[in-house]
Protein backbone atom coordinates (compact mmCIF):
# COMPACT_ATOMS: atom_id res chain seq x y z
CA UNK A 1 0.00 0.00 0.00
CA UNK A 2 2.30 2.79 -1.19
CA UNK A 3 1.79 6.27 0.18
CA UNK A 4 2.60 8.94 -2.42
CA UNK A 5 3.71 12.35 -1.14
CA UNK A 6 3.14 15.21 -3.61
CA UNK A 7 5.14 18.47 -3.83
CA UNK A 8 2.53 20.41 -1.82
CA UNK A 9 2.92 17.95 1.06
CA UNK A 10 -0.40 16.20 0.48
CA UNK A 11 -0.47 12.41 0.43
CA UNK A 12 -2.40 9.75 -1.44
CA UNK A 13 -2.55 6.10 -0.43
CA UNK A 14 -3.04 3.26 -2.90
CA UNK A 15 -3.97 -0.37 -2.30
CA UNK A 16 -1.41 -1.67 -4.79
CA UNK A 17 1.55 -0.53 -6.86
CA UNK A 18 0.69 2.35 -9.18
CA UNK A 19 2.28 4.06 -12.15
CA UNK A 20 3.07 7.76 -12.34
CA UNK A 21 0.21 8.10 -14.82
CA UNK A 22 -2.17 6.34 -12.38
CA UNK A 23 -1.37 8.92 -9.71
CA UNK A 24 -1.86 11.77 -12.18
CA UNK A 25 -5.26 10.33 -13.17
CA UNK A 26 -6.21 9.96 -9.52
CA UNK A 27 -5.52 13.67 -9.03
CA UNK A 28 -7.55 14.65 -12.10
CA UNK A 29 -8.12 13.96 -15.81
CA UNK A 30 -6.52 17.25 -16.82
CA UNK A 31 -3.25 16.35 -15.12
CA UNK A 32 -3.33 12.84 -16.59
CA UNK A 33 -3.67 14.34 -20.06
CA UNK A 34 -0.75 16.72 -19.44
CA UNK A 35 1.48 14.16 -17.69
CA UNK A 36 4.71 13.49 -19.56
CA UNK A 37 6.80 11.82 -16.86
CA UNK A 38 7.42 11.86 -13.13
CA UNK A 39 10.13 12.58 -10.62
CA UNK A 40 10.08 9.77 -8.05
CA UNK A 41 12.30 10.34 -5.02
CA UNK A 42 14.23 12.86 -7.09
CA UNK A 43 14.73 10.60 -10.12
CA UNK A 44 13.12 11.25 -13.51
CA UNK A 45 11.10 8.25 -14.70
CA UNK A 46 8.62 7.39 -17.43
CA UNK A 47 4.90 7.90 -16.84
CA UNK A 48 4.47 4.12 -17.03
CA UNK A 49 6.97 3.51 -14.21
CA UNK A 50 5.47 1.54 -11.32
CA UNK A 51 5.80 2.83 -7.76
CA UNK A 52 5.70 -0.08 -5.33
CA UNK A 53 6.70 1.58 -2.03
CA UNK A 54 6.19 4.89 -0.26
CA UNK A 55 7.67 7.69 -2.37
CA UNK A 56 7.68 11.38 -3.13
CA UNK A 57 6.35 12.22 -6.59
CA UNK A 58 6.26 15.29 -8.81
CA UNK A 59 4.24 15.02 -12.01
CA UNK A 60 6.22 16.40 -14.97
CA UNK A 61 4.36 18.28 -17.73
CA UNK A 62 5.49 20.28 -20.75
CA UNK A 63 5.42 23.39 -18.56
CA UNK A 64 8.44 22.04 -16.67
CA UNK A 65 11.95 22.42 -18.05
CA UNK A 66 12.48 18.67 -17.74
CA UNK A 67 9.18 18.08 -19.53
CA UNK A 68 10.28 20.19 -22.48
CA UNK A 69 13.54 18.25 -22.70
CA UNK A 70 11.63 14.95 -22.65
CA UNK A 71 9.29 16.20 -25.36
CA UNK A 72 12.28 17.20 -27.52
CA UNK A 73 13.96 13.86 -26.99
CA UNK A 74 10.79 12.10 -28.09
CA UNK A 75 10.73 14.29 -31.21
CA UNK A 76 14.17 12.91 -32.02
CA UNK A 77 12.64 9.42 -31.88
CA UNK A 78 9.77 10.67 -34.04
CA UNK A 79 12.38 11.83 -36.56
CA UNK A 80 13.86 8.33 -36.48
CA UNK A 81 10.40 6.83 -37.04
CA UNK A 82 9.80 9.07 -40.06
CA UNK A 83 13.20 8.66 -41.70
CA UNK A 84 13.01 4.86 -41.45
CA UNK A 85 9.65 4.97 -43.21
CA UNK A 86 10.96 7.19 -46.01
CA UNK A 87 14.40 5.58 -46.34
CA UNK A 88 14.29 2.14 -44.67
CA UNK A 89 18.00 1.45 -45.21
CA UNK A 90 18.97 4.36 -42.94
CA UNK A 91 21.12 3.40 -39.96
CA UNK A 92 20.37 5.41 -36.82
CA UNK A 93 23.24 6.63 -34.64
CA UNK A 94 22.41 9.02 -31.76
CA UNK A 95 19.66 11.58 -31.22
CA UNK A 96 20.16 13.71 -28.10
CA UNK A 97 18.50 16.85 -26.77
CA UNK A 98 20.34 20.16 -27.26
CA UNK A 99 19.50 23.76 -26.38
CA UNK A 100 16.02 24.54 -27.75
CA UNK A 101 15.78 21.30 -29.68
CA UNK A 102 17.34 18.02 -30.76
CA UNK A 103 19.29 16.35 -33.53
CA UNK A 104 19.75 12.88 -34.95
CA UNK A 105 22.89 11.56 -36.64
CA UNK A 106 22.05 9.14 -39.44
CA UNK A 107 23.98 7.01 -41.90
CA UNK A 108 22.22 7.25 -45.25
CA UNK A 109 23.42 6.30 -48.74
CA UNK A 110 22.17 9.60 -50.19
CA UNK A 111 22.83 13.22 -49.37
CA UNK A 112 19.71 14.79 -47.93
CA UNK A 113 18.40 17.93 -49.63
CA UNK A 114 16.14 20.73 -48.45
CA UNK A 115 13.27 19.00 -50.25
CA UNK A 116 14.08 15.82 -48.32
CA UNK A 117 14.00 17.80 -45.08
CA UNK A 118 10.54 19.16 -45.95
CA UNK A 119 9.29 15.66 -46.79
CA UNK A 120 10.72 14.32 -43.54
CA UNK A 121 8.98 17.01 -41.51
CA UNK A 122 5.70 16.32 -43.31
CA UNK A 123 5.97 12.61 -42.47
CA UNK A 124 6.76 13.45 -38.82
CA UNK A 125 3.65 15.65 -38.62
CA UNK A 126 1.51 12.88 -40.11
CA UNK A 127 2.85 10.34 -37.62
CA UNK A 128 2.45 12.66 -34.63
CA UNK A 129 -1.15 13.40 -35.68
CA UNK A 130 -1.98 9.71 -35.08
CA UNK A 131 -1.43 10.31 -31.34
CA UNK A 132 -0.10 6.80 -30.94
CA UNK A 133 1.11 5.46 -27.59
CA UNK A 134 4.85 5.12 -27.02
CA UNK A 135 5.51 1.73 -25.44
CA UNK A 136 8.56 1.22 -23.24
CA UNK A 137 10.04 -2.23 -22.66
CA UNK A 138 12.96 -3.03 -20.37
CA UNK A 139 14.91 -5.90 -21.86
CA UNK A 140 18.15 -7.74 -21.25
CA UNK A 141 21.35 -6.54 -22.87
CA UNK A 142 21.38 -9.58 -25.17
CA UNK A 143 17.76 -9.11 -26.20
CA UNK A 144 18.43 -5.47 -27.07
CA UNK A 145 21.46 -6.46 -29.11
CA UNK A 146 19.47 -9.13 -30.94
CA UNK A 147 16.75 -6.59 -31.79
CA UNK A 148 19.15 -4.09 -33.33
CA UNK A 149 21.33 -6.68 -35.01
CA UNK A 150 18.24 -8.08 -36.72
CA UNK A 151 17.34 -4.58 -37.87
CA UNK A 152 20.82 -3.88 -39.21
CA UNK A 153 21.34 -1.02 -36.73
CA UNK A 154 25.12 -1.32 -36.48
CA UNK A 155 25.57 1.90 -34.51
CA UNK A 156 23.10 0.80 -31.83
CA UNK A 157 24.92 -2.54 -31.62
CA UNK A 158 28.24 -0.73 -31.19
CA UNK A 159 26.76 1.42 -28.41
CA UNK A 160 25.58 -1.72 -26.63
CA UNK A 161 28.94 -3.43 -27.07
CA UNK A 162 31.06 -0.50 -25.96
CA UNK A 163 28.93 1.64 -23.65
CA UNK A 164 26.35 -0.50 -21.89
CA UNK A 165 27.14 -3.09 -19.22
CA UNK A 166 26.10 -6.68 -19.89
CA UNK A 167 24.02 -6.81 -16.70
CA UNK A 168 22.14 -3.61 -17.59
CA UNK A 169 18.55 -3.59 -18.82
CA UNK A 170 18.31 -1.12 -21.72
CA UNK A 171 15.02 0.64 -22.38
CA UNK A 172 13.51 0.05 -25.82
CA UNK A 173 10.89 2.58 -26.92
CA UNK A 174 8.40 1.34 -29.51
CA UNK A 175 6.90 3.90 -31.89
CA UNK A 176 4.58 1.58 -33.75
CA UNK A 177 6.98 -0.47 -35.95
CA UNK A 178 10.00 1.71 -35.12
CA UNK A 179 12.18 0.83 -32.11
CA UNK A 180 14.79 3.07 -30.48
CA UNK A 181 16.98 2.65 -27.42
CA UNK A 182 17.29 5.23 -24.66
CA UNK A 183 17.61 5.73 -20.94
CA UNK A 184 14.47 7.87 -21.14
CA UNK A 185 12.12 9.04 -19.99
CA UNK A 186 9.96 9.74 -23.05
CA UNK A 187 6.43 10.98 -23.64
CA UNK A 188 3.71 8.34 -23.17
CA UNK A 189 1.82 9.46 -26.26
CA UNK A 190 2.71 11.44 -29.38
CA UNK A 191 -0.03 14.00 -28.73
CA UNK A 192 2.68 15.83 -26.79
CA UNK A 193 4.86 16.16 -29.93
CA UNK A 194 2.85 18.25 -32.39
CA UNK A 195 4.84 21.49 -32.35
CA UNK A 196 8.23 21.10 -33.97
CA UNK A 197 10.27 22.26 -36.94
CA UNK A 198 13.21 20.66 -38.73
CA UNK A 199 15.83 23.34 -39.23
CA UNK A 200 19.02 22.30 -40.97
CA UNK A 201 21.50 19.56 -41.77
CA UNK A 202 25.24 19.24 -41.33
CA UNK A 203 27.97 16.63 -41.32
CA UNK A 204 29.18 14.97 -38.13
CA UNK A 205 31.77 12.26 -37.59
CA UNK A 206 30.60 9.21 -35.67
CA UNK A 207 31.62 9.69 -32.04
CA UNK A 208 33.20 13.02 -33.02
CA UNK A 209 36.27 11.23 -34.39
CA UNK A 210 37.51 12.33 -37.82
CA UNK A 211 38.84 8.80 -38.37
CA UNK A 212 35.26 7.52 -38.36
CA UNK A 213 32.57 7.80 -41.01
CA UNK A 214 30.93 11.15 -41.68
CA UNK A 215 27.22 10.97 -40.82
CA UNK A 216 24.40 13.39 -41.65
CA UNK A 217 23.08 15.37 -38.70
CA UNK A 218 19.49 16.61 -38.84
CA UNK A 219 18.58 19.43 -36.44
CA UNK A 220 15.13 20.31 -35.16
CA UNK A 221 13.39 22.38 -32.52
CA UNK A 222 10.32 21.41 -30.51
CA UNK A 223 8.05 23.26 -28.09
CA UNK A 224 5.06 22.63 -25.88
CA UNK A 225 2.58 24.62 -27.98
CA UNK A 226 2.15 26.51 -31.24
CA UNK A 227 2.70 29.92 -29.65
CA UNK A 228 6.07 28.93 -28.16
CA UNK A 229 7.22 27.44 -31.47
CA UNK A 230 6.17 30.54 -33.41
CA UNK A 231 7.89 32.84 -30.91
CA UNK A 232 11.11 30.85 -31.11
CA UNK A 233 11.12 30.84 -34.92
CA UNK A 234 10.57 34.61 -34.89
CA UNK A 235 13.52 35.02 -32.53
CA UNK A 236 15.62 32.89 -34.87
CA UNK A 237 14.63 35.11 -37.79
CA UNK A 238 15.61 38.20 -35.82
CA UNK A 239 18.87 36.53 -34.79
CA UNK A 240 19.59 35.84 -38.46
CA UNK A 241 19.19 39.54 -39.22
CA UNK A 242 21.57 40.32 -36.37
CA UNK A 243 24.15 37.67 -37.33
CA UNK A 244 27.51 39.26 -36.57
CA UNK A 245 29.03 37.60 -39.62
CA UNK A 246 26.59 39.37 -41.96
CA UNK A 247 26.84 42.70 -40.15
CA UNK A 248 30.62 42.39 -39.92
CA UNK A 249 30.75 42.10 -43.70
CA UNK A 250 28.24 44.92 -44.27
CA UNK A 251 30.17 47.28 -41.99
CA UNK A 252 33.60 46.10 -43.18
CA UNK A 253 34.71 45.19 -39.64
CA UNK A 254 36.74 42.03 -40.27
CA UNK A 255 37.06 38.96 -42.41
CA UNK A 256 38.26 35.37 -42.07
CA UNK A 257 39.71 33.11 -44.74
CA UNK A 258 40.65 29.50 -45.34
CA UNK A 259 44.40 30.10 -45.11
CA UNK A 260 44.02 31.05 -41.43
CA UNK A 261 40.99 29.15 -40.06
CA UNK A 262 39.63 30.58 -36.84
CA UNK A 263 41.91 33.65 -37.05
CA UNK A 264 40.55 37.17 -37.46
CA UNK A 265 41.72 39.71 -40.03
CA UNK A 266 40.62 42.95 -38.39
CA UNK A 267 39.84 45.80 -40.78
CA UNK A 268 40.20 49.43 -39.73
CA UNK A 269 36.66 49.87 -38.41
CA UNK A 270 36.61 46.54 -36.55
CA UNK A 271 40.02 47.23 -35.04
CA UNK A 272 38.74 50.62 -33.90
CA UNK A 273 36.02 48.86 -31.89
CA UNK A 274 38.59 46.39 -30.54
CA UNK A 275 40.90 49.19 -29.36
CA UNK A 276 38.02 51.11 -27.77
CA UNK A 277 37.09 48.01 -25.78
CA UNK A 278 40.70 47.64 -24.68
CA UNK A 279 40.83 51.29 -23.65
CA UNK A 280 37.62 50.94 -21.68
CA UNK A 281 38.81 47.83 -19.82
CA UNK A 282 42.23 49.39 -19.28
CA UNK A 283 40.53 52.30 -17.53
CA UNK A 284 38.67 49.87 -15.29
CA UNK A 285 41.92 48.08 -14.46
CA UNK A 286 43.34 51.35 -13.21
CA UNK A 287 40.16 52.12 -11.28
CA UNK A 288 40.25 48.72 -9.55
CA UNK A 289 44.01 48.85 -8.88
CA UNK A 290 45.39 46.22 -11.27
CA UNK A 291 48.84 46.00 -12.76
CA UNK A 292 48.91 45.42 -16.51
CA UNK A 293 51.55 42.97 -17.72
CA UNK A 294 52.50 41.20 -20.94
CA UNK A 295 53.68 37.59 -21.03
CA UNK A 296 55.46 35.79 -23.87
CA UNK A 297 53.57 34.38 -26.81
CA UNK A 298 54.99 30.88 -26.33
CA UNK A 299 56.85 28.99 -23.63
CA UNK A 300 58.79 25.73 -23.32
CA UNK A 301 56.78 22.52 -23.02
CA UNK A 302 58.47 21.89 -19.65
CA UNK A 303 56.58 24.79 -18.09
CA UNK A 304 53.24 23.54 -19.43
CA UNK A 305 54.02 20.10 -18.01
CA UNK A 306 54.72 21.59 -14.59
CA UNK A 307 51.51 23.61 -14.69
CA UNK A 308 49.48 20.52 -15.59
CA UNK A 309 48.18 22.00 -18.83
CA UNK A 310 50.18 19.65 -21.04
CA UNK A 311 48.39 16.64 -19.60
CA UNK A 312 44.92 18.14 -19.96
CA UNK A 313 45.18 20.51 -22.96
CA UNK A 314 48.00 19.18 -25.17
CA UNK A 315 45.57 18.31 -27.99
CA UNK A 316 44.24 21.87 -27.98
CA UNK A 317 47.67 23.54 -28.01
CA UNK A 318 49.64 24.64 -31.06
CA UNK A 319 53.29 23.66 -30.76
CA UNK A 320 56.53 24.41 -32.55
CA UNK A 321 60.17 23.37 -32.23
CA UNK A 322 63.44 25.24 -32.23
CA UNK A 323 66.97 24.11 -31.31
CA UNK A 324 65.71 20.73 -30.09
CA UNK A 325 63.21 22.33 -27.71
CA UNK A 326 59.44 22.04 -27.98
CA UNK A 327 57.36 25.14 -27.35
CA UNK A 328 53.62 25.62 -26.92
CA UNK A 329 51.83 28.74 -28.08
CA UNK A 330 49.91 29.78 -25.01
CA UNK A 331 46.22 28.83 -24.79
CA UNK A 332 45.87 30.90 -21.59
CA UNK A 333 47.76 33.51 -19.59
CA UNK A 334 47.89 32.09 -16.06
CA UNK A 335 51.23 30.19 -16.09
CA UNK A 336 52.98 33.28 -17.43
CA UNK A 337 51.50 35.43 -14.69
CA UNK A 338 52.84 33.06 -12.03
CA UNK A 339 56.31 33.47 -13.58
CA UNK A 340 56.02 37.24 -13.19
CA UNK A 341 54.85 36.82 -9.58
CA UNK A 342 57.86 34.60 -8.87
CA UNK A 343 60.35 37.32 -9.77
CA UNK A 344 61.57 38.69 -6.45
CA UNK A 345 60.64 37.81 -2.89
CA UNK A 346 57.00 38.52 -2.03
CA UNK A 347 55.70 39.41 1.42
CA UNK A 348 52.17 39.24 2.77
CA UNK A 349 52.33 43.03 2.61
CA UNK A 350 52.50 42.77 -1.21
CA UNK A 351 49.19 40.95 -1.32
CA UNK A 352 46.73 41.12 -2.86
CA UNK A 353 48.61 41.50 -6.13
CA UNK A 354 46.28 41.96 -9.11
CA UNK A 355 47.81 41.19 -12.49
CA UNK A 356 45.94 41.71 -15.79
CA UNK A 357 46.82 41.14 -19.43
CA UNK A 358 45.25 41.47 -22.85
CA UNK A 359 46.78 38.13 -23.73
CA UNK A 360 46.91 36.84 -27.29
CA UNK A 361 45.99 33.15 -26.93
CA UNK A 362 45.52 30.28 -29.36
CA UNK A 363 43.63 27.01 -29.06
CA UNK A 364 43.39 24.31 -31.69
CA UNK A 365 39.60 24.13 -31.77
CA UNK A 366 38.06 21.56 -34.16
CA UNK A 367 37.44 23.16 -37.54
CA UNK A 368 33.78 22.14 -37.48
CA UNK A 369 33.17 24.10 -34.28
CA UNK A 370 34.52 27.43 -35.59
CA UNK A 371 31.83 30.10 -35.89
CA UNK A 372 32.70 33.66 -36.89
CA UNK A 373 33.95 35.64 -33.89
CA UNK A 374 32.06 33.43 -31.43
CA UNK A 375 34.39 30.43 -31.73
CA UNK A 376 37.91 31.11 -32.97
CA UNK A 377 41.40 29.70 -32.65
CA UNK A 378 43.21 32.98 -32.05
CA UNK A 379 41.72 35.32 -29.45
CA UNK A 380 42.54 37.98 -26.90
CA UNK A 381 41.62 37.31 -23.27
CA UNK A 382 40.94 40.15 -20.88
CA UNK A 383 41.67 37.95 -17.91
CA UNK A 384 43.49 38.74 -14.70
CA UNK A 385 44.99 36.81 -11.83
CA UNK A 386 44.86 37.91 -8.24
CA UNK A 387 47.40 36.51 -5.79
CA UNK A 388 46.09 36.77 -2.25
CA UNK A 389 45.87 35.10 1.14
CA UNK A 390 42.98 32.87 2.09
CA UNK A 391 41.70 35.60 4.39
CA UNK A 392 41.52 38.04 1.47
CA UNK A 393 39.41 35.82 -0.80
CA UNK A 394 36.00 37.23 0.11
CA UNK A 395 37.03 40.87 -0.26
CA UNK A 396 38.83 40.25 -3.57
CA UNK A 397 35.98 38.20 -5.03
CA UNK A 398 33.53 40.90 -3.98
CA UNK A 399 35.61 43.51 -5.83
CA UNK A 400 35.67 41.25 -8.90
CA UNK A 401 31.88 41.00 -8.80
CA UNK A 402 31.52 44.79 -8.60
CA UNK A 403 33.87 45.17 -11.56
CA UNK A 404 31.92 42.60 -13.61
CA UNK A 405 28.62 44.41 -13.05
CA UNK A 406 30.25 47.79 -13.61
CA UNK A 407 31.47 46.66 -17.04
CA UNK A 408 28.32 44.81 -18.12
CA UNK A 409 26.12 47.73 -17.07
CA UNK A 410 28.01 50.03 -19.44
CA UNK A 411 26.92 47.85 -22.36
CA UNK A 412 23.31 47.68 -21.18
CA UNK A 413 23.33 44.06 -20.02
CA UNK A 414 21.02 43.79 -17.03
CA UNK A 415 19.74 40.21 -17.20
CA UNK A 416 22.70 38.32 -15.74
CA UNK A 417 22.43 34.78 -14.35
CA UNK A 418 24.96 33.92 -11.66
CA UNK A 419 26.04 30.36 -10.85
CA UNK A 420 28.20 29.12 -7.98
CA UNK A 421 29.95 25.82 -8.69
CA UNK A 422 31.16 23.86 -5.66
CA UNK A 423 33.59 21.00 -4.99
CA UNK A 424 33.65 17.99 -7.30
CA UNK A 425 34.32 14.48 -6.01
CA UNK A 426 37.86 14.49 -7.41
CA UNK A 427 39.65 17.53 -5.99
CA UNK A 428 42.77 18.76 -4.28
CA UNK A 429 42.95 20.55 -0.94
CA UNK A 430 41.37 19.82 2.41
CA UNK A 431 37.63 19.88 3.06
CA UNK A 432 38.24 22.73 5.51
CA UNK A 433 39.90 24.83 2.79
CA UNK A 434 37.00 24.12 0.43
CA UNK A 435 34.49 25.00 3.16
CA UNK A 436 36.15 28.38 3.65
CA UNK A 437 36.53 29.05 -0.07
CA UNK A 438 32.93 28.20 -0.94
CA UNK A 439 31.67 30.23 2.01
CA UNK A 440 33.78 33.20 0.88
CA UNK A 441 32.35 33.10 -2.65
CA UNK A 442 28.79 32.76 -1.37
CA UNK A 443 29.32 35.58 1.11
CA UNK A 444 30.70 37.84 -1.63
CA UNK A 445 27.63 37.17 -3.77
CA UNK A 446 25.26 37.88 -0.88
CA UNK A 447 27.22 41.01 0.04
CA UNK A 448 26.61 42.30 -3.49
CA UNK A 449 22.91 41.51 -3.28
CA UNK A 450 23.03 38.77 -5.91
CA UNK A 451 20.86 35.70 -6.20
CA UNK A 452 22.67 32.69 -7.60
CA UNK A 453 22.08 29.15 -8.76
CA UNK A 454 24.07 26.54 -6.87
CA UNK A 455 25.79 23.91 -9.01
CA UNK A 456 27.00 21.22 -6.60
CA UNK A 457 30.01 19.28 -7.83
CA UNK A 458 30.53 21.50 -10.90
CA UNK A 459 33.63 23.33 -9.65
CA UNK A 460 37.08 22.63 -11.04
CA UNK A 461 39.27 20.12 -9.21
CA UNK A 462 41.43 23.01 -8.02
CA UNK A 463 38.75 25.34 -6.65
CA UNK A 464 35.14 26.62 -6.70
CA UNK A 465 34.01 29.24 -9.19
CA UNK A 466 31.37 31.83 -10.02
CA UNK A 467 30.04 32.13 -13.57
CA UNK A 468 28.24 35.13 -15.04
CA UNK A 469 25.93 34.47 -18.00
CA UNK A 470 24.54 37.38 -19.99
CA UNK A 471 21.10 37.21 -21.58
CA UNK A 472 20.81 39.40 -24.66
CA UNK A 473 17.82 41.11 -26.27
CA UNK A 474 16.78 37.78 -27.85
CA UNK A 475 17.15 36.03 -24.47
CA UNK A 476 20.15 34.04 -25.68
CA UNK A 477 22.63 33.08 -22.99
CA UNK A 478 26.32 34.02 -23.26
CA UNK A 479 28.66 32.78 -20.55
CA UNK A 480 31.39 35.43 -20.37
CA UNK A 481 32.58 36.27 -16.88
CA UNK A 482 34.21 33.92 -14.38
CA UNK A 483 35.76 34.21 -10.95
CA UNK A 484 37.66 30.99 -10.28
CA UNK A 485 39.64 30.10 -7.17
CA UNK A 486 42.78 28.05 -7.72
CA UNK A 487 44.54 26.18 -4.92
CA UNK A 488 46.76 24.21 -7.32
CA UNK A 489 48.61 26.25 -9.94
CA UNK A 490 50.62 28.58 -7.67
CA UNK A 491 52.03 25.60 -5.77
CA UNK A 492 52.79 23.64 -8.94
CA UNK A 493 54.77 26.57 -10.31
CA UNK A 494 56.56 27.43 -7.07
CA UNK A 495 54.77 30.66 -6.11
CA UNK A 496 55.26 31.63 -2.45
CA UNK A 497 55.15 34.63 -0.17
CA UNK A 498 56.53 35.25 3.30
CA UNK A 499 53.75 35.48 5.86
CA UNK A 500 53.57 37.36 9.15
CA UNK A 501 55.08 34.26 10.77
CA UNK A 502 58.19 34.64 8.56
CA UNK A 503 57.36 31.29 6.95
CA UNK A 504 56.78 30.69 3.26
CA UNK A 505 53.18 30.17 2.16
CA UNK A 506 51.55 29.42 -1.20
CA UNK A 507 49.16 32.19 -2.26
CA UNK A 508 45.62 31.56 -3.42
CA UNK A 509 45.13 32.49 -7.06
CA UNK A 510 41.90 33.99 -8.38
CA UNK A 511 41.36 33.73 -12.14
CA UNK A 512 39.10 36.58 -13.25
CA UNK A 513 37.64 37.23 -16.71
CA UNK A 514 34.94 39.74 -17.62
CA UNK A 515 34.59 39.93 -21.39
CA UNK A 516 36.19 36.52 -21.79
CA UNK A 517 37.54 36.91 -25.30
CA UNK A 518 37.44 40.35 -26.91
CA UNK A 519 36.69 38.78 -30.28
CA UNK A 520 33.68 36.88 -28.96
CA UNK A 521 32.44 39.87 -26.97
CA UNK A 522 32.55 42.05 -30.10
CA UNK A 523 30.48 39.35 -31.83
CA UNK A 524 27.98 39.43 -28.95
CA UNK A 525 27.81 43.25 -29.03
CA UNK A 526 27.38 43.29 -32.80
CA UNK A 527 24.31 41.07 -32.48
CA UNK A 528 23.00 42.78 -29.34
CA UNK A 529 23.14 46.20 -31.00
CA UNK A 530 22.37 44.90 -34.52
CA UNK A 531 25.44 46.86 -35.60
CA UNK A 532 24.10 50.08 -34.04
CA UNK A 533 27.10 50.48 -31.75
CA UNK A 534 26.83 53.19 -29.08
CA UNK A 535 28.55 56.39 -30.12
CA UNK A 536 31.66 55.77 -28.00
CA UNK A 537 32.23 52.40 -29.72
CA UNK A 538 31.16 53.33 -33.26
CA UNK A 539 34.08 53.28 -35.72
CA UNK A 540 32.85 56.51 -37.32
CA UNK A 541 30.91 58.67 -34.89
CA UNK A 542 29.79 61.42 -37.25
CA UNK A 543 29.77 62.16 -40.97
CA UNK A 544 29.62 65.76 -42.21
CA UNK A 545 27.81 66.11 -45.55
CA UNK A 546 27.57 69.11 -47.83
CA UNK A 547 24.53 69.74 -50.02
CA UNK A 548 26.46 71.47 -52.82
CA UNK A 549 30.09 72.25 -53.56
CA UNK A 550 29.56 75.68 -51.97
CA UNK A 551 29.66 74.10 -48.49
CA UNK A 552 32.62 71.75 -49.08
CA UNK A 553 35.17 73.87 -47.24
CA UNK A 554 32.78 74.35 -44.31
CA UNK A 555 32.12 70.59 -44.10
CA UNK A 556 35.86 69.91 -43.96
CA UNK A 557 36.22 72.56 -41.25
CA UNK A 558 33.44 70.98 -39.12
CA UNK A 559 34.94 67.50 -39.52
CA UNK A 560 38.34 68.85 -38.47
CA UNK A 561 36.82 70.46 -35.36
CA UNK A 562 35.30 67.10 -34.39
CA UNK A 563 38.52 65.18 -35.02
CA UNK A 564 40.60 67.77 -33.16
CA UNK A 565 38.35 67.14 -30.14
CA UNK A 566 39.25 63.44 -30.25
CA UNK A 567 36.12 62.29 -32.04
CA UNK A 568 36.03 60.07 -35.12
CA UNK A 569 34.48 62.07 -37.97
CA UNK A 570 34.59 62.12 -41.76
CA UNK A 571 33.55 64.62 -44.42
CA UNK A 572 31.53 63.23 -47.34
CA UNK A 573 32.02 65.71 -50.18
CA UNK A 574 30.85 63.48 -53.02
CA UNK A 575 28.73 65.02 -55.75
CA UNK A 576 25.65 63.02 -54.74
CA UNK A 577 22.19 64.02 -53.60
CA UNK A 578 22.01 64.59 -49.84
CA UNK A 579 19.26 61.96 -49.49
CA UNK A 580 21.54 59.37 -51.08
CA UNK A 581 24.38 60.24 -48.71
CA UNK A 582 22.13 60.10 -45.65
CA UNK A 583 20.76 56.70 -46.66
CA UNK A 584 24.22 55.28 -47.29
CA UNK A 585 25.61 56.37 -43.93
CA UNK A 586 22.42 55.21 -42.18
CA UNK A 587 23.06 51.74 -43.60
CA UNK A 588 26.62 52.00 -42.28
CA UNK A 589 25.09 52.68 -38.82
CA UNK A 590 26.94 55.99 -38.32
CA UNK A 591 25.39 57.52 -35.17
CA UNK A 592 25.24 61.14 -36.36
CA UNK A 593 24.82 62.65 -39.81
CA UNK A 594 25.66 66.33 -39.93
CA UNK A 595 24.31 68.30 -42.88
CA UNK A 596 25.39 71.77 -43.97
CA UNK A 597 23.72 73.97 -46.55
CA UNK A 598 24.10 77.68 -47.18
CA UNK A 599 21.97 78.59 -44.13
CA UNK A 600 24.11 76.51 -41.77
CA UNK A 601 27.32 77.97 -43.20
CA UNK A 602 26.03 81.50 -42.78
CA UNK A 603 24.91 80.87 -39.19
CA UNK A 604 28.01 78.88 -38.20
CA UNK A 605 25.80 75.89 -37.35
CA UNK A 606 25.21 72.32 -38.44
CA UNK A 607 21.99 70.30 -38.90
CA UNK A 608 21.99 67.06 -36.93
CA UNK A 609 20.23 63.79 -37.82
CA UNK A 610 20.57 60.41 -36.12
CA UNK A 611 20.88 57.01 -37.79
CA UNK A 612 17.40 56.20 -36.50
CA UNK A 613 15.96 59.08 -38.51
CA UNK A 614 15.47 61.65 -35.75
CA UNK A 615 15.98 65.31 -36.74
CA UNK A 616 17.66 67.03 -33.79
CA UNK A 617 17.67 70.49 -35.38
CA UNK A 618 20.69 72.74 -35.78
CA UNK A 619 23.53 73.33 -33.32
CA UNK A 620 26.41 75.77 -33.18
CA UNK A 621 29.47 73.73 -34.13
CA UNK A 622 31.25 74.35 -30.82
CA UNK A 623 28.18 73.25 -28.86
CA UNK A 624 27.77 70.07 -30.90
CA UNK A 625 31.44 69.21 -30.45
CA UNK A 626 31.04 69.61 -26.69
CA UNK A 627 27.86 67.51 -26.59
CA UNK A 628 29.30 64.70 -28.70
CA UNK A 629 32.48 64.70 -26.64
CA UNK A 630 30.40 64.46 -23.46
CA UNK A 631 28.39 61.52 -24.85
CA UNK A 632 31.58 59.67 -25.80
CA UNK A 633 33.40 60.39 -22.55
CA UNK A 634 30.42 59.31 -20.41
CA UNK A 635 29.92 56.28 -22.68
CA UNK A 636 26.33 57.18 -23.38
CA UNK A 637 25.25 58.25 -19.89
CA UNK A 638 24.71 61.78 -21.28
CA UNK A 639 23.41 61.77 -24.84
CA UNK A 640 23.20 64.57 -27.40
CA UNK A 641 19.44 64.21 -27.83
CA UNK A 642 18.97 64.69 -24.10
UniProtKB/Swiss-Prot annotation:
Single GO MF annotation: ATP binding
Keywords: Aminoacyl-tRNA synthetase, ATP-binding, Cytoplasm, Ligase, Metal-binding, Nucleotide-binding, Protein biosynthesis, RNA-binding, tRNA-binding, Zinc
Pfam family, one: tRNA_SAD
SMART domains reported in the protein's UniProt record: tRNA_SAD
Cofactor(s) this protein cannot do without: Zn(2+)
Co-factor note (free text): Binds 1 zinc ion per subunit.
Main localization (coarse): cytoplasm
One record GO biological process: threonyl-tRNA aminoacylation
Reactions it catalyzes: tRNA(Thr) + L-threonine + ATP = L-threonyl-tRNA(Thr) + AMP + diphosphate + H(+)
InterPro entries: aa-tRNA-synt_IIb, aa-tRNA-synth_II, aa-tRNA-synth_II/BPL/LPL, Anticodon-bd, Anticodon-bd_dom_sf, Beta-grasp_dom_sf, TGS, TGS-like
GO cellular component: cytosol
Positions of the TGS domain: 1-61
Superkingdom of origin: Bacteria
EC number(s) recorded for this UniProt protein: 6.1.1.3
Transmembrane segments: none
Subcellular location per the Swiss-Prot or TrEMBL entry: Cytoplasm
UniProt: Zn(2+) binding residues: 334, 385, 511
Residue ranges of the region described as Catalytic: 243-534
Quaternary data: Homodimer.
Role noted for this protein: Catalyzes the attachment of threonine to tRNA(Thr) in a two-step reaction: L-threonine is first activated by ATP to form Thr-AMP and then transferred to the acceptor end of tRNA(Thr). Also edits incorrectly charged L-seryl-tRNA(Thr).
Assigned protein family: Belongs to the class-II aminoacyl-tRNA synthetase family.
Protein name: Threonine--tRNA ligase
Taxonomic source organism: Aeromonas salmonicida (strain A449)
